[in-house]
């Protein structure tokens, strides 16, 4: 990894956030967490290279947060990978049509998550 990428993990499940953060940091990423979409939206999201975003959360879903990000010129190009326990084609298509860069169904293997993160970041770097 040439530079340290910043990744934000947005998920309402604390053990999942902590586990992902640990694995990402062991792989050389800088990883921050937010327990909700509302909390994430208070951060300077432009400082991140990628967001791992759970779809099913409390007051605001990951889909709603992604729509806000894509509607804002400052964050419209920010790569998003959806994480969800709902593994339906309709959910996957909705997320990808909204502008997500990938979609990972829970439960997942960390190797799969790391490979997908790497692929999305490589594509994002080529677009810059």
Please tell me what each predicted stretch does.
Residues 11, 54, 84:
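Active-site residues of response regulator receiver
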Residues 33-50:
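Acidic, metal-coordinating helix/loop segments flanking the phosphotransfer/catalytic sites
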Residues 14-32:
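Two-component/phosphorelay signaling modules centered on CheY-like receiver
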Residues 4, 47-49, 74-79:
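His-Asp phosphorelay/catalytic-motif detector in bacterial-type signaling
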Residues 35-36, 61-64:
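Acidic catalytic/metal-coordinating carboxylates
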Residues 17, 53, 58, 67, ...:
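The feature encodes the CheY-like receiver
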Residues 108-121:
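C-terminal output helix
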């Amino acid at each position: 990894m040439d530079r340290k990428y910043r990744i934000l993990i947005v998920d309402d499940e604390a053990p999942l956030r902590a586990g992902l953060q640990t694995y990402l940091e062991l792989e050389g990423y800088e990883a921050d967490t937010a327990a909700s979409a509302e909390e994430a939206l208070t951060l300077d999201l432009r400082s991140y290279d990628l967001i791992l975003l759970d779809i099913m959360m409390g007051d605001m879903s990951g889909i709603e947060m992604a729509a806000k990000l894509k509607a804002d010129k400052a964050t419209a190009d920010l790569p998003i990978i959806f994480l969800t326990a709902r593994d339906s084609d309709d959910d996957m298509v909705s997320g990808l049509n909204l502008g997500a860069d990938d979609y990972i169904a829970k439960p997942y293997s960390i190797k799969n998550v790391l490979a997908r993160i790497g692929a999305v970041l490589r594509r994002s770097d080529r677009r810059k």
